[in-house]
Amino acid sequence: MDISKTLYRYNAFDGNPEMFVRCSFSFYTCNGTLAVCMYRKPSHTMWIPDLYRLCSEPYAKITCNIPASTLLGYDEQFVNENDMPEIGAWLIVNGIAKPTGKYLVTEDGLLEAFRFVLPRNVYAEIKKMRRLMNTEPPSLREADNSKD
């Protein structure tokens, strides 16, 4: 949906060289919750301005789509550090997301929820999708019902 205009330096922590990435914010089609991906821009292609439009595959999916995601706010999502060690710290250092203090224990390990700094249009789109799919966060659903 939206690829951030900021180009971040990212070290994959797996022996690969440092690369340049941009974040993409979208939503999972099954429940409308926030989906965050990283798109790679190899350093030897830095001179190509619209490379991201040519690349359709993300380097990495930062968030994970699980049923408990519907309990989180519109701008929150669980981050899986099993596949990308240290990604939580990287998100914080670069000002992309902040920890919420919410955790979920799964068979794959402990997942931490983060609140992402989203562009307004992305936030509005996710809010709209979650209303359409009836997967709004419970606290917001109760607040809307109390207004009636």
Task: List the predicted regions and their residue ranges.
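Ser/Thr- (and often Asn-) enriched beta-sheet segments in non-cytosolic proteins
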Residues: 6, 24, 63, 115-117
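OB-fold ssDNA-binding interfaces and closely related basic DNA-contact patches used
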Residues: 1-53
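Short, compact, well-ordered microdomains
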Residues: 80-133
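Acidic, aromatic-enriched beta-alpha/helix-loop junctions
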Residues: 42-95
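Short acidic DE-rich linear segments
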Residues: 145-148
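Short, intrinsically disordered terminal segments enriched in charged and Pro/Gly residues
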Residues: 137-141
